[in-house]
Amino acid sequence: MTDLRHYDVIVSPSITEKSTLVSEQNQVVFNVAKGASKPEIKAAVEALFGVKVTAVNTLVRKGKLKRFRGFAGKQKDVKKAIITLAEGQSIDVSTGL
């Protein structure tokens, strides 16, 4: 049985042009919790999807400054994790958890 904390670590799959390109190199991209560490992300992916993770790379996309009705605001920062899977393993991100 999976730990409920794993569901707090992985927020959503990131489906972009770049993430579909890296899927050919056996990698998947997820939006993760801001405070999640690489070992926590690795454990969550292995527990939830039943795959072997070989590497985890993370990045923080800074929120953009936007204007709404004349008032300046800022979008939230988003932390992404690029997960490299073992050979022969894959994750179908189009289905839910």
Swiss-Prot record:
GO CC annotation: ribonucleoprotein complex; ribosome
Residue ranges of the TM segments: none
Gene3D superfamilies hit by this protein: 3.30.70.330
GO biological process assignments: translation
Alphabetical UniProt keywords: Ribonucleoprotein, Ribosomal protein, RNA-binding, rRNA-binding
InterPro entries per UniProt: Nucleotide-bd_a/b_plait_sf, Ribosomal_uL23-like, Ribosomal_uL23/eL15/eS24_sf
Domain of life: Bacteria
UniProt keyword RNA-binding present: yes
GO molecular function: rRNA binding; structural constituent of ribosome
Subunit and interaction comment: Part of the 50S ribosomal subunit. Contacts protein L29, and trigger factor when it is bound to the ribosome.
Known function: One of the early assembly proteins it binds 23S rRNA. One of the proteins that surrounds the polypeptide exit tunnel on the outside of the ribosome. Forms the main docking site for trigger factor binding to the ribosome.
Family, per entry: Belongs to the universal ribosomal protein uL23 family.
The protein's name in its UniProt record: Large ribosomal subunit protein uL23
